[in-house]
Amino acid sequence: MKDEYETIVRSGIKLQLDCPDLALSRHMTFKSESDEDFIKIAYQNMEILNQSLHNISPEMLRLHVCWGNYEGPHIHDIPIEKIFDVLMSFKGNYLLFESSNPRHQHEWEIFDQLKNKIPENKILIPGVLDTTSNFVEHSSLVKQRIEKFVNIVGK
């Protein structure tokens, strides 16, 4: 995909990579593996991805990671703190992730605890709406979700 990625970026479009292999696949494809083994697999995937992006400027790259957009209990989702270092190793500047569904809404605290490990160039893009619910969140709640991350990274 290296050539395709480079062609997309040369045309002036930012490249967003949707990577279910970094979170969702933990409880779908690799459910029989230990968390430690899964993290090794995720690091290998990230290394290969970063190699394929070698010739692309980080400001043109976005990575989207999620645990699946389905209405289910999500009790087997890998916590973000376990894959945090993998995500921070992404070559690109932009990191998009879920932060509003009931299973992951608390994980802003992990970003706060680990804020010193967030690279200076990393731009966090938290998902501030729950796409698995038919409830419409109040604008004040959405504002609070955004402010939590602004207070962590200061931007």
For the regions a protein language model found, what residue spans apply to each?
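Domain-level signal for soluble alpha/beta catalytic cores
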Residues: 1-155
